[in-house]
Amino acid sequence: MYGYIYYFIFNLLVASFTFTLLRLYFLGDINQKNIYQFLTKIFLSKITFILFITLTSLNYLLDSYCEVIFISLNNSFVLINSFFNKLLTSNSLSINLIDVYAYPFIYVFLLITVLSIFFCMTYNTDELLTFMFYCLVILVSGYTLFFTDSLILFFFAYEMLLIPSFFILYKFAKTRRCVEAAYLMFFWTQFGALFLIFCFMYIFILCRDSSFSNISNYYFSSFEVNFIFICLLIGFGVKLPIWPFYGWLPKAHVEASTNFSIFLSGVLVKFAFFGLLKCLFTIQLEPTFIYIYPFLTIGIIDAVFKLFYQIDLKKLVAYSTVVEMHWLTICVVSGQSNLMLSSFCMMISHALLSTNSFLLVDAVARRFKTRLITEISGLNFMCPKLFLAVLLNTLIFLGFPGSIFFVSEFLFFTFFFDLFPLLSLFLLNFLYLLGPTFFFRSWMNIMFGYSNFLSNRLPNDLTSRETILFLGIPFLMYWLGISWQFLVI
């Protein structure tokens, strides 16, 4: 299945390269004198991007043909990798579990990156090349973050994600508030990096080693486990983000361009989730600090009630992503394998759902010249195709059966009820009753009702390309929801 996804994404990249060349040639965005120089830059940028994806594909194919055999020795299991003729002990099992999360996330990351690049086709050549270069830096840093065994290299790769993210938000800024949002994101992320530095230095002083595989053999006391866990949660929680550190995220979404909003919610936030997951898995922490659940519950309550009075569509979607990230963090910090499965489905569904939501917000804003809920209504009369796309996306957010988002919700409440019955009932009211009600209430005002635009010139409905895009992402979510069991094999 993953091979087909890679094949599809590779052809999309080739098609985008061809489309860019034709666009530059026929629209005359560059002078004839410098055409070869600009085409060379574009060719090198595209080829570099495709080459790195090809190397990733080869790495996956190499792992796919590695036959892993389980042998029972003295009531314990030993793994034998027949391709490399290696004996993998039980300590390496946690690193193999990380690959279960890593590879599907890489495919989702590549898909969202391609969508962002297609969205940038409306920009000029320099902005397109700049955005592709930053995407390549993020891809290299993210790939290093996934598969490195060094604690130091892991930290540098995680911090390298901030530099292109800041420049994307700063260079594509159109207003002064966007520049302020870029600096706010930068300083909040560096605040979280301080806790990561303290945590990694503390681990290095204790273990005298910077390798994840060697650190996993060290025994941490209860105090050390809780201290490391709190530092990791604050360090990665700033970028997840969780309460009370998520103030920068809605501001960044509102002021940023749509391509960065897609990239931020679908890719960059997930790197923080994956970094926290890798540290907890590979260091094999079993935290006993249960007081983190009240903080995450407060974050869910705060974000849900902020959904009620939002009048900006982008900020509404941003706060809905905050609710889901708190939900995702609860699954991770629980340490239960069943809830880890729920977080796996939630990670993929959140990336696709938030991407589709921000694209729909941009489609509405381009047609009505505003994102304010109070000024938009009657979408079902004026743009029937856009109305159907918004309605389908909203139903998926409400947990309509069949999608992978519904699967993640079902798994979460099924297993979380056994751990904390009262807390699960409390969260059920907010995540299934109040949150979706506030979210759907705002979209109801947009989709239905009489509009003042009816007396004026009607806006254009969705184009064929937009229709395929807005229906393709929900189709992918339903396909993953039906075949979700194949994702965890």
Feature map (PLM): residue ranges:
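Transmembrane helix-loop-helix hairpins at membrane boundaries of multipass inner-membrane proteins
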Residues: 1-133
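C-terminal ends of transmembrane helices
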Residues: 18-37, 114-125, 167-177, 240-253, ...
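Alpha-helical multi-pass transmembrane bundles of energy-transducing inner-membrane proteins
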Residues: 133, 137-220, 307-371
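Interfacial segments of multi-pass membrane proteins
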Residues: 253, 329-335, 409-424
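Predominantly late transmembrane helices and immediately cytosolic-facing juxtamembrane segments
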Residues: 354-357, 426-456
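Cytoplasmic/organellar membrane-interface segments at the starts of transmembrane helices
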Residues: 383, 440-489
